[in-house]
Amino acid sequence: LNEMFLVANTYPTGSQEFIDVFETAVRMYPQSEIANINAATAALSRNELVSAERYLGMVNSNKNLPEYNNAMGILMLMKGDYELSKKYLKVAEQLGLDAARGNLEELVRKKANAAKMKKNGK
């Protein structure tokens, strides 16, 4: 599994090749929680929320990982559950994941846009 992660990182993040490696890894190691978190992240990059939720649902013991909390935060953000998104992203940030800070900033922007649209009656 580690070798597959190293291969994935030879491709640009988010590229089809990068995503394909993570999807292959989760097929080869379906019980690996790390493989499922990586596959969920790849699914989120393609806006495949159902797949991402299924992969994240396979994580049972590694819910303290910042990557898991970040992925859950992004999933909840994309589903429009801003409060739950904030909860997960705050945990990821507190666990030291720098990307979570940027995602929290995105959450603030999304909430502001949603409030503005609601105010304008859209």
Model segments located where?
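Start-of-helix register in tetratricopeptide repeats
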Residues: 2, 34, 67, 99-102
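Alpha-helical solenoid repeat scaffolds, predominantly canonical TPR units
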Residues: 21, 54-55, 88
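Canonical tetratricopeptide repeat
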Residues: 3-6, 38, 71, 103-106
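Single-residue signature of alpha-solenoid repeat helices
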Residues: 18, 51-52, 85
